[in-house]
Amino acid sequence: MSDPDSELPEEPNVDPPQEEPKRIVIPSILHSFYEDRPFVSCTRCGESLRDFSEGFRISKSFKGDEVIIESAMCMPCMAAMMEETSDESKQKLEKFHEKHHREVSGFDECALCECTLDEVRDTEFNLVGVCQGDDMLDSAMICFDCQEAMNEIISEETRRTWDRFREENFPGVPADFEPLPSRPAPLLP
């Protein structure tokens, strides 16, 4: 007697259908405070952010509920900024991230330590979103202490490059303004 199952054709190996990632629209907290709308163009090159299939990154620094500085940069400009970063700084930042990076996403807790947004809400912190079109693909909160720790390890060459970027793209910001100081603030007389 033959096995009835052996006469059936084999089912092809088919992976179960993949669920589409849930679409997350860029939240209003990452819209431009100064323009009172979503970011439209790259802070560095001025091109339309929608023109970059690679996406873009929005960064906003806060002191309490006040926006201190904000930018949106296309990925090619982000890559160019990294190219302008000294090799010494790249190596130190890579080691820092290897040691401290946490597998968390969102704004509830720091991506580099266990500090929560509630704990830093009244101080300084950064919010970052990696976006494409109208969608936010990933996000992170970085507390002041972690930002300061990264600022302390960058080289003077990199610091000058980043200062030049700030001066060229944020002309209204005073030359001695440090949204996340990398050096002690000068004492007032």
Region spans (language model):
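Short, charged low-complexity linear segments at domain edges
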Residues: 9-25, 41-54, 77-94, 113-125
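Cys/His-clustered metal-coordination modules, chiefly Zn-binding fingers
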Residues: 99-103, 117-137, 142-145, 156-165
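Short, Lys/Arg-enriched charge-dense amphipathic segments
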Residues: 75-85, 111-118, 128, 144-153, ...
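Short recognition patches in nucleic-acid-associated and regulatory proteins
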Residues: 36-68, 105-136
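Short, intrinsically disordered terminal segments enriched in charged and Pro/Gly residues
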Residues: 2-34, 83, 87-104, 155-189
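Short metal-binding segments enriched for Cys and/or His
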Residues: 67-92, 136-162
